[in-house]
Amino acid sequence: MKKNLILFGSFILLTLLTVTAKAQEMDPLLQAKEYFRQLDSICSADNGLLWGVNLYGPVMLVSPADRVIIANRQNKSNTLVEKEGVFIGRLPDNTGIANTAFEWDGELWTMAMWNALSPDDNNARNRLLVHECWHAKQQSVGIMPVMTQNTHLDQEEGNILMRLELMALSRALQAVDLQEIKSYTTDALLLRHYRQALFPNNNENEFERHEGMAEYTGYRLCGMSDLEIRKQLVTDLETYAGKTALANSFAYITGPAYGFTLDRLTTGWIGKVRTGEALPGIAAETSGLTYPPDTLALHVAVSGIVEKYNAGVFVAATKEAFKEEMLETGACYRYDRHYFRI
């Protein structure tokens, strides 16, 4: 009996210790402290090597449900309360909650929503946090924030050409031979150049510098190997290539896709981005691409890419899907004479 009581007591003690350990593990303050430690370590390891500035700064994690803040430092007005090595408070009601960089209490802060941070996937969490930290520093490295002005990517011609570009970028990331990488990169650039000739009132390149470089930086510093990153990007490119709405999101995939392709082709390209150059221009120079002289010649080149990728069925199916969607919504369907007929 005594032996059984000892065993039972040991079981209870073990259970209590396990529950206590799990409770500590799930304590949001301790979690946040660990998240900040990892982020600080990542940014300190880079220490400006990538962009010339250390990306670590004021960071707050916000619970959307109750607007509770857990921050890595005190705010200027000293209104946050220190506890467990972090600072807690409440975000004012007139301040929006998002994954973003914003000015608060006289400082530029990085904000991340608590429920957007994976407790189990360090790489995914750090990628998001680094992405937003980069936004807080982007103007200091010469890149202005912009809103997308690319509604053509949600329309038939623009959408198809963008999705073909994504297919080309996927092939470039998967290629091993240097000439193959350049060839597929050239295909992507020709598709973009043609699309931008058809839709000149776009800011694709500017939006790509804004969101694409944030996402590239998140990937570059999050802790994944280059091979792991390229595999993840290929998977994501396949997902994006199935979307009929890309105006607001394309740069999150094209930016890192071009970035990690350029990493395999050249060095020092980030310095060119900082001085105002766009990724397609840098990639064209690196690949030795000379664009066809006019839209008609571009049309011929793009039609050749469609044939090379056996994408005729994809183009036809996507055109039909857009037509059906327009008919369902009562919109007027228009066939654009500029678009290739295959």
Region locations from a protein language model:
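Bacterial Sec-dependent N-terminal signal peptides
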Residues: 1-26
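N-terminal mature-domain "stem" immediately C-terminal to a signal peptide or N-terminal signal-anchor/transmembrane
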Residues: 24-83, 214
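Non-catalytic terminal regions of proteins
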Residues: 38-41, 271-342
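Catalytic zinc-binding patch centered on the HExxH motif and its immediate surroundings
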Residues: 88-107
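Short pre-active-site segment immediately N-terminal to the catalytic Zn-binding motif
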Residues: 114-129
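Active-site recognition of the HExxH zinc-binding catalytic motif
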Residues: 127-139
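Post-HExxH zinc-binding segment in Zn-dependent metallohydrolases
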Residues: 140-196, 204-230
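Active-site-proximal alpha-helical
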Residues: 198-228, 237-293
